[in-house]
Amino acid sequence: MTTPALLPLSGRRIPPLNLGPPSFPHHRATLRLSEKFILLLILSAFITLCFGAFFFLPDSSKHKRFDLGLEDVLIPHVDAGKGAKNPGVFLIHGPDEHRHREEEERLRNKIRADHEKALEEAKEKLRKSREEIRAEIQTEKNKVAQAMKTKETRVLPPVPVPQRVGVSGGDPEDMEIKKKRDKIKEMMKHAWDNYRTYGWGHNELRPIARKGHSTNIFGSSQMGATIVDALDTLYIMGLHDEFMDGQRWIEENLDFSVNSEVSVFEVNIRFIGGLLAAYYLSGEEIFKTKAVQLAEKLLPAFNTPTGIPWAMVNLKSGVGRNWGWASAGSSILAEFGTLHMEFVHLSYLTGDLTYYNKVMHIRKLLQKMERPNGLYPNYLNPRTGRWGQYHTSVGGLGDSFYEYLLKAWLMSDKTDHEARRMYDDAVEAIEKHLIKKSRGGLVFIGEWKNGHLERKMGHLACFAGGMFALGADGSRKDKAGHYLELGAEIARTCHESYDRTALKLGPESFKFDGAVEAVAVRQAEKYYILRPEVIETYWYLWRFTHDPRYRQWGWEAALAIEKSCRVSGGFSGVKDVYAPTPVHDDVQQSFFLAETLKYLYLLFSGDDLLPLDHWVFNTEAHPLPVLRLANSTLSGNPAVR
């Protein structure tokens, strides 16, 4: 309603109202103009309200048959005379009229009874005290907790365990090589003992500050990442007292029912991989049990529209999300593509194909997708199933996806031909578009970004030299020699990246622009955080060629780590490998014990220690046995040689 029509206009006169005799004799007999206006305003508003209410009232004909809405809904209304033989006779259901009315009445009574029961239950709830409500909630929580505990302590089905071939030994005959191996073992002892003293139970160690350290990939909880990551290294080095200390901590303290958001990828390769390796090496059931408990906590991460898992998951709530920086909320190729080895072993050990089906679904989805230039972009949106920005790398964000294609084939005793085919296709595309030779003759692997090649190689990509050597046997067109040579060229390039620094340690990434070759240009790329990839490649090439240069290069790296990274409280990364005096970052990474020192130890050991025809190393250097299955089911009987 608009108000201007009710307001007095200039020049308009309002006739006096005859209001009858005054209620109170002592009042004036006449009213002022303003008082008359107020009365007129009130009267106008009252009349408007009455007329408005009349027009806005609902049509009463809509409610002639209200009665809970049952008669018109449950028994259709029939107008008089429609279909009737005699006018004036009402037929609702013909001869069954009484039966239907009885059914209607019973249904109406049931609905009323249910309604009254629900009201009574609600009243009863409201009558309860806060203490009673809290007690009921706690009872329900206890039931859920007990169910979880029962699930966690259930006995896993017995399965034949592959033979523990070459889990110890490997003593070199050459005394000089043995001295070098003993030195690596001493470095491991120094790293472990200081973690044991200053960071026990924490994820990692700050060796200069001498206290625990953690990053967001492990969440907010103290999950003992270094303990789990280092167990298999301790075992193969024969440090059994230290191994038992770690086992006791895991039995008594490792708990996954914590409100902590963790990286699915990192927890899989470090924790599940580490626990599975410790189980296969030692035979201790606690490691298998813990691995399965943790794996169940990761499964909610796969609850996405496409089945591509989130990067992060809360271990308690199961809520997942992706990294905010990852191309419009995409999942990362190297993360969701680096689950296959561990999940296949989980299905084998439990008889539960859920894990196997999760990773096979990822593979099938990737096979169907169009790949620009045959390359896999680093980003995939888990909601839409579409690629993010077209950035392809064999280094960070992409690396271990290609590694796991090859290792899925090797771990299956070379029967997973689909994985091998995908690996071969990918390597051919990488050779065509990413691998180049610099003016100085150094072979490097660049990165493809939005249609052009960036002539930069990361330290993480240096693992590829070992991958090419590992995949040489079984390659297409009898190109084994070619890929072994390609691996050697990558190893030489990565060695140059070490040799061209003041500390003889490699930078995080290095360029090949003009006169600049195998050298970091930006300050943010000059750090070394105890990474293993170059030494990993040396070890694989040593195993396949026994060329002494790889042991020599590995020893150079070990001496550089000892000189520039060793501190009284452990080992630390350095911020600038080109500065002659090291500035430490004060972090002893868990992968230094899991990978770097393990690969150095194996480099100076005999080939009978963890032979490659029986063991396949996951991307965190945790050895998992080849599964030689007698039939197509993962939980079937393996034909172990």
Swiss-Prot record:
It comes from the Eukaryota. Pathway: Protein modification; protein glycosylation. It is found in: Golgi apparatus membrane. Disulfide bonds join C462-C494. The modification N-acetylthreonine is found at T2. Involved in the maturation of Asn-linked oligosaccharides. Progressively trim alpha-1,2-linked mannose residues from Man(9)GlcNAc(2) to produce Man(5)GlcNAc(2). Belongs to the glycosyl hydrolase 47 family. This is Mannosyl-oligosaccharide 1,2-alpha-mannosidase IB. It comes from Mus musculus.
